[in-house]
């Protein structure tokens, strides 16, 4: 597998296997989008994520093992309360917005509980759309 300069990590210590599940969904062609609250990005991180549009990126697991490559096709903002349907579908939720929202409430539960994240209808999400690259 070719390793690209740009890197995207799925998973974190204590994620109860979520990162691995997301990587498996990418590999199976079931996941073609990801998102994170804009408030969790630094200015430099925001600049960097927007520059990934059109770029090839290597996906790593939480143990820093390269797992696959993706091509980022678009990066944009949407809100948690009215998410762009490309995000909802790309996350594997079809047209089920409420399911998408509940999945992300659970994924970000620790951040919400610790006060690091306030999640509401107006929370801005940075969205990355991508396709799996076989190389």
Curated annotation (Swiss-Prot):
Pfam family membership, one? ASCH
Q: What is this protein called?
A: Uncharacterized protein YhfF
Database matches in InterPro entries: ASCH_domain, DUF984, PUA-like_sf
Q: Which domain of life is it from?
A: Bacteria
Q: Where is the ASCH domain?
A: 18-130
Q: Which residues form the signal peptide?
A: none
């Amino acid at each position: 597998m070719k390793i690209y300069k740009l890197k995207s990590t799925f998973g974190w210590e204590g994620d109860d296997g979520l990162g691995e599940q997301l990587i498996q969904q990418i590999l199976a062609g079931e996941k073609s989008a990801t998102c994170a609250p804009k408030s969790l990005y630094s200015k430099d991180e925001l600049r960097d994520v927007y520059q990934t549009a059109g770029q090839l990126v290597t996906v790593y697991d939480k143990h820093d093992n390269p797992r696959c490559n993706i091509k980022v096709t678009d990066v944009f903002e949407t809100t948690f309360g009215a998410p762009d349907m490309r995000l909802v579908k790309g996350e594997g939720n079809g047209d089920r917005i409420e399911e998408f929202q509940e999945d992300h409430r659970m994924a970000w539960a620790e951040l919400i509980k610790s006060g690091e994240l306030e999640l509401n209808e107006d929370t801005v999400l940075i969205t990355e759309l991508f396709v799996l690259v076989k190389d």
